[in-house]
């Protein structure tokens, strides 16, 4: 089994998933995500080719609540601009699928990947198909009376991208990290902290999607306090109380802030306790950069470029945590490191 070509392919696929996350963020922030009102997996590959085609697409958009509420009277040129943003988003998604599927078939036929790896990557393929449906499911939520996509569906869309990224990148790390003859000695607490951090990062990414979907980044644009308060007064005005966790903009932002500080604290502790393990510094640097990006995004009222960088870097932070766990599994003999199967 030749690992290098497979590893390069997995790395490319992982990068393309991150690219898709960035393009998706730009599409959302540009308010272009609802400009294409139909989902045509095959025939939708081509954009409108004639003036008549463009007119038909614009007429479909004019029937949507978003047009009537937010973009009433936009010109054809303005419509083309938002349409092409969403079109590129969908086109790159299709391209990502091809970049994964075609080499995958080739590597299987040439027997360059083991049966275990084939199964794992086939699972990634299934999640990719599910992701396509989830994307349209999300868009549909904004084509109803309220021209705003569901933040729950937005979180699902992002979470599925994270699962695909995890499956691809972890397999890439597995190929790249070579076990050393002298095994590392790590405590059970190290594994516990590493796993906890990974889980918290996933939860944090979900709440990041909630912040984005609820426009919660447009309130309390101060740091470290929330308009002069450690705990704002309007955290629990929704009933029942538990609903505030998911639908109260102030509460969602508060949780997102708190999780960021908790993750930073745990990563610092992990770094101090494992100063001799180099990958832990990648994770520390990643979490610091991510928090800085988040604070700048908040203080500057969500500038598009910084907000996209913040969204993209959440995957890099997740990847650094995943890499650390994979490194531990490869470089230690402790049975507790079998959190991820080889």
From Swiss-Prot:
Heme binds at residues 256, 310. This is Heme A synthase. It is found in: Cell membrane. The gene is ctaA. Its EC number is 1.17.99.9. The chain crosses the membrane at residues 6-26, 88-108, 117-137, 154-174, 196-216, 252-272, 288-308, 309-329. Belongs to the COX15/CtaA family. Type 2 subfamily. Catalyzes the conversion of heme O to heme A by two successive hydroxylations of the methyl group at C8. The first hydroxylation forms heme I, the second hydroxylation results in an unstable dihydroxymethyl group, which spontaneously dehydrates, resulting in the formyl group of heme A. GO terms for biological process: heme A biosynthetic process. It comes from the Bacteria. It is an enzyme of class 1 (oxidoreductase). HAMAP family: HemeA_synth_type2 (MF_01665). GO terms for cellular component: plasma membrane. It catalyses: Fe(II)-heme o + 2 A + H2O = Fe(II)-heme a + 2 AH2. Its main location: membrane. Pfam families: COX15-CtaA. The lineage of its organism: Bacteria, Pseudomonadati, Pseudomonadota, Alphaproteobacteria, Rickettsiales. It comes from Wolbachia sp. subsp. Drosophila simulans (strain wRi). Interacts with CtaB. Keywords: Cell membrane, Heme biosynthesis, Iron, Membrane, Metal-binding, Oxidoreductase, Transmembrane, Transmembrane helix. Pathway: Porphyrin-containing compound metabolism; heme A biosynthesis; heme A from heme O: step 1/1. Its cofactor is heme b. GO terms for molecular function: metal ion binding; oxidoreductase activity, acting on NAD(P)H, heme protein as acceptor. It is a multi-pass membrane protein.
